[in-house]
Amino acid sequence: MIQKETQLNVCDTSSVWVVNTFHIYRGFRHRIGRLGDYIKVSIRSTKPECTIKRGKKKKAIIVRHAFGRLKRDGSFSKFSSNVCVLLKKRTAPLGREIKGPIFYGVKKKKFVASFPGRV
């Protein structure tokens, strides 16, 4: 579960390592973001050759979080870290490819990028 001021890793090839959450697009009373939710982030750490500077604001989508999730078939999935993908537009990722497994519920959000794995 992602709240405001949560730091997340980035799993695409946009040369950004760490971002900080400051807004969750979920509704007025919802303070916690879950898998597949859109968030607004600020860039905290980048590679030296990156064109995106520290402090810039971007939109992102949550693709993994450390809080466990019970699936409909009864299995339990849990990731080791909180991870997001930076977005250019509402559905276009900033990097060319996405690294690591992605939760299958993100595909239901009509996210047009092809994902490497399914969990």
Curated annotation (Swiss-Prot):
GO biological process, one term: translation
Family annotation (SUPFAM superfamilies): Ribosomal protein L14
A single GO cellular-component term on record: ribosome
Location (main, coarse): mitochondrion
GO MF, one annotated term: structural constituent of ribosome
Keywords associated with the record: Mitochondrion, Ribonucleoprotein, Ribosomal protein
Keyword match Transport: no
Matches recorded under Pfam families: Ribosomal_L14
Localization (cell): Mitochondrion
PANTHER family: 50S/60S RIBOSOMAL PROTEIN L14/L23 (PTHR11761), LARGE RIBOSOMAL SUBUNIT PROTEIN UL14M (PTHR11761:SF3)
Sequence similarity: Belongs to the universal ribosomal protein uL14 family.
HAMAP family: Ribosomal_uL14 (MF_01367)
Protein name: Large ribosomal subunit protein uL14m
Taxonomic source organism: Paramecium tetraurelia
